[in-house]
A protein has these predicted regions:
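Basic, helix-initiating cap at the start of DNA-binding domains
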Residues: 1-29, 33-38, 55
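C-terminal peripheral helix-coil segments that are non-catalytic and often amphipathic
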Residues: 2, 91, 123, 127-138, ...
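Helix-turn-helix/winged-helix DNA-binding modules
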Residues: 27-28, 48, 139
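Short, hydrophobic secondary-structure boundary micro-motifs
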Residues: 31, 69, 98-104, 141-142
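Short hydrophobic/aromatic patch on the recognition helix
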Residues: 40-50
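Short amphipathic alpha-helical segment with a characteristic S/N-K-E followed by hydrophobic residues
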Residues: 52-57, 68
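Hydrophobic alpha-helical connector segments
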Residues: 59, 70-95, 109-113
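Short secondary-structure transition hinges
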Residues: 91-127, 152-160
Length: 179
């Protein structure tokens, strides 16, 4: 029984990672068979873990929020840790493109996820900003919500324009934080 639970957890982790990669490559409408193939499992396993596409999207969203919130930034200076975290945040934003298509923005799930996102990521960003400001590496007047909103807005253009380089624009924004 314990082996089965370990296998189920491993399959779920593989599915979440595979779905996140598929969503980046093809959006949240990526075929379930492609996600299953990336994870090395059968299509039935996908549906056992996530009965609907919305369930899968919500799980990937939460998984990505947790990965961003719990990122290991040890050994990095304050500014380098902030810059690395923002890179991870951009990865998360790219993954979540199309969430509104899978979940209606007026649905309770959408509101709960947005609150979850803010509750988990704002404090992390705030701590990183405070550390970088205390180290004298960035200006001290930047608020976490402002920065996250700015990064998010810079990432929006990438969804519809393959020539749009959100990472470059975000890198310019982050460089502009320097004191």
């Amino acid at each position: 029984m314990a082996t089965r639970r370990v296998d189920a957890r491993r399959n779920e982790q593989a599915l979440l990672d595979a779905a996140a990669a598929a969503f980046v490559a093809a959006g949240v409408e990526a075929p379930v068979r492609d996600i299953a193939a990336r994870a090395g499992v059968g299509v039935g396993t996908v549906y056992r873990h996530f009965p609907t596409r919305a369930d899968l999207v919500v799980a990937v969203y939460r998984h990505q929020v947790e990965a961003c919130a719990e990122a290991d930034l040890t050994g990095l200076g304050a500014y380098a840790a902030l810059a690395r975290w923002i890179d991870l945040f951009v990865d998360f934003l790219v993954t979540k493109h199309g969430l509104a298509a899978a979940l209606r923005p007026d649905s309770p799930d959408f509101a709960v996820l947005h609150t979850y996102f803010l509750d988990r990521l704002l404090p992390v960003c705030a701590r990183l900003l405070e550390a970088a400001a205390a180290a004298g590496e960035i200006r001290a007047d930047v608020q976490a919500y402002e920065l996250m909103r700015g990064v998010g807005n810079l990432c929006i253009g990438a969804e519809h324009d393959p020539g749009y380089d959100a990472r470059r624009l975000v890198a310019l924004l982050v460089a502009g934080l320097r004191s």
